[in-house]
Amino acid sequence: MAKKSMIEREKKRQKLVNKYAVKRKELKEQIKTSVSFEERFKLQLELQKLPRNSSPTRLHNRCSVTGRPKGYYRDFGLSRHVLREMAHECLLPGVTKSSW
């Protein structure tokens, strides 16, 4: 189980990303379409003034049960350990153990 502070920190980052997503997208579009160097530079400075944690690059996928950051399965939102346990207990519909 991950530390609660790390899980909360990741939730806080997700809120910031959602809050500033529209503004960040608009600024990036303006930077792409601007012609003059001065205007582009001014827009770039404005983009840099946004909070650092509002960038989607700083997000890290975590297991929704344990908060584990590694071995994350995007389709389920779970780490490999929890996925295996839940699959064995038939808690994930449509997931079967493979055999050939």
Swiss-Prot record:
GO terms for MF: rRNA binding; structural constituent of ribosome
Superkingdom of this protein's organism: Eukaryota
GO biological process: translation
Protein name, entry field: Small ribosomal subunit protein uS14c
Pfam family, one: Ribosomal_S14
Family of the protein in this entry: Belongs to the universal ribosomal protein uS14 family.
Biological role: Binds 16S rRNA, required for the assembly of 30S particles.
